[in-house]
Amino acid sequence: MDRPLGENYAGVLRVSAVKSYIKLKENIDYDDYLDINNLQKHCLDFDETTLKLEIDYKLSRAVGESGALNSINEFMYYNNNELIGYIGICHFGGDTLEVNGMVHPEFRRRGVFKKLFRLVKDEWAKRNAQNMLLLSDNNSISGQEFIKSIGASYEHTEYEMFLTSKHKQDILLDNVVLRKANNKDAREITYQDSIYFEIEDKEEDIRIPEDEEKSGMITYLAEVDDKIIGKVRLEVSNSNNIGGIFGLGVKPDYRGKGYGREILIGAIEKLKERNSKEIMLQVATKNNKALNLYKSCGFVETSIMDYYQISK
């Protein structure tokens, strides 16, 4: 299984004549989703760690997309038609790609991940993105070892947090109104992202809210007296009934007034209205103010994800 890669045709790289091949795709379909989900279960059960693969989001975005291979985001290593290795690329705007992956416990230390990662780097070289973030659970020995072996530098750490069922929200939205964003708000959303995440405000990174809503990602603008003071993005997964809260922020001129808490409570209520059984979010460990806010609203830390960076 460690022989050099063979020829590339129709999005498939043959690793050996009989047993192994690598499938390359721009988007996953439902069969891919099932294969990746099955591999993820094997890895999580064995390692007792977490992964950030975003496959529910990817599947929902792929609906209606053409089958043309314009860029490669999905790298799948099969052995006897069983998926044993996977790396996925995510791009959420800016000049940075996010990469996460896994190898079946029974097929580790055989060069599977290295082969996939070489292909990922080849794809990265073709793109304008200057940086690549590699994600690993803080407790993943194999993940941390691989990242160290390629010389990536530590970037930051995030907690994944889930809302406890015991916590009761007793704060009313007295000031903040959450309005679902439409396409006219696209520039405003990109502008706010550039503030909160310290990324350049580029025209090509503009997200179209009504298109994202088709993929289960809904952005709400927070308004006070008809003025936009912040935003939040909610992800609704139909496959596992987990609702996600992302990109929550308050503009600098409106901070210190309790609006962040009101936006958070409003986001929780929106997800409950959509029948989310569990609600999660992610926060940088260095962001003590946000961390304390989330804890005070009933969120508890469930895992730690480390981010490492390599650059061109």
At which residue positions do the language-model features occur?
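Conserved hydrophobic beta-strand within the GNAT/NAT acetyltransferase core sheet
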Residues: 99, 132-135, 245, 279-283
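Acyl-donor-binding surface of acyltransferase catalytic domains
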Residues: 4-17, 93, 105-174, 305-310
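A short beta-loop-alpha structural element at the N-terminal edge
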Residues: 19-38, 176-189
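Residue-level recognition of the GNAT/N-acetyltransferase active site
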Residues: 100, 104, 108, 137, ...
